[in-house]
Every structure is written in C-alpha cells, then in structure tokens.
C-alpha cells in the first residue's frame, strides 16, 4: 500500500519534478556531481523523512554540490526511530 503524502510533501515534490522536467534539460548535460542527482535526492528525502526534514537534508546536499566537493555516491540517510528509555 502506498504511503499518502501531506499537502506540503506533494507541493515540494511537484515543484522539484517541475524543475526536473522544465528547467534541468536546458542546463545541459548532467552537472550534478552526486549520485543520485540532487533533485532526485530531494524527492527521496521528502518522501522518506517528511517535508521539513526532507527539505533540510536536500538543502544541505545542494550546498555540498560545488566544484570544490568531490561528489560521489550520497544516498538519503535511513529514517531512524527515536524511543525514550
């Protein structure tokens, strides 16, 4: 069964998909130095962690995407469950 998205998650992922479809193709070849790309990472992070934490993770990832960073494979961190002991 598919997990339902909150309206904020839907909005964020729709805006990112719009970027992927309408803006990214005009920027030339794949310029992201990471795998998965920053936009794909953002969608995965928002779907897994929710809109607030997912956007925070995506922003941190985008800030690392510059010529001085080596890039490479950088998957979305798994969701951890906090429990009080």
UniProtKB/Swiss-Prot annotation:
The keyword Membrane applies. It is found in: Cell inner membrane. One of its GO terms (cellular component) is plasma membrane. SMART domains: Haemolytic. InterPro entries: Membr_insert_effic_factor_YidD (IPR002696). It is a peripheral membrane protein. Its main location: membrane. Keywords: Cell inner membrane, Cell membrane, Membrane. Could be involved in insertion of integral membrane proteins into the membrane. Belongs to the UPF0161 family. This is Putative membrane protein insertion efficiency factor.
């Amino acid at each position: 069964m598919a997990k339902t998205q909150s309206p904020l998650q839907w909005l964020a992922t729709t805006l990112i998909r719009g970027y992927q479809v309408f803006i990214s193709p005009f920027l030339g070849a794949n310029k992201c130095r990471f795998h998965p790309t920053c936009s794909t990472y953002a969608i995965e992070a928002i779907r897994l962690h929710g809109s607030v934490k997912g956007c925070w993770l995506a922003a941190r990832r985008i800030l690392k995407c510059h010529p001085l960073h080596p890039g490479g494979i950088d998957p979305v961190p798994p969701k951890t469950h906090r429990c009080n002991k």
